[in-house]
Amino acid sequence: MNFECIINHIERTALDFNRSKGERAVPKVNELNIASQKRDRYPGNHKKVTEGYERIAVGDAMELTQFGVNKVTVAPGASTALNHWHENEDEFVIILSGEVVLVENNNETTLRAGDCAGFKAGEPVGHHLINKSSEMAVLFEVGTRRDNEVVNYPGVDFTYRKVNGIVTFVKKDGSVAT
């Protein structure tokens, strides 16, 4: 267990103790105490698209259940995701620093610090962000949390399916994508 994990455990224990006494601790978490995560969930060679994407799941650290909040860094040349759209979950991003290119279908829009973009659930417009600059980009991504979700990837032979919280990537022929 590393030092950051120990601090996180101590903070969580204190929070749980206060809640058990009917008290609410100050809802404060420092992002420096949260381990970052890489996005490597895609099957096969598709993982390469998001090399250079890292997130800090601040919403998880705050025990939020209705929506996720991630502080994301995107290295030059990296994408936040494959081109996709959600059937049941809204998405929102706000750029904190640097710049990324929002790709929606074949249209590109540059987003810089302070710019926001939102993606309504059920609208079949494929989208993703790419850092085409030479500097790191930092953004917040916020999205609905559903136990059941389908994410479509136009131009790719699989979909993301979440049923009762269990995630599977399924090919168009019905087999599991690996």
Residue ranges and their predicted role:
Residues 17, 22-66, 152-178:
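A short, N-terminal "cap"/entry segment at the start of jelly-roll beta-barrel domains
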Residues 70-86:
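Conserved short histidine dyad/triad with adjacent acidic residue
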Residues 89-90, 94-100:
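Glycine- and acidic-residue-biased ligand/ion/polar-headgroup-sensing regions
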Residues 106-121:
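Short acidic-glycine-tyrosine-enriched beta hairpin
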Residues 121-148:
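Ligand-binding loop in jelly-roll beta-barrel domains
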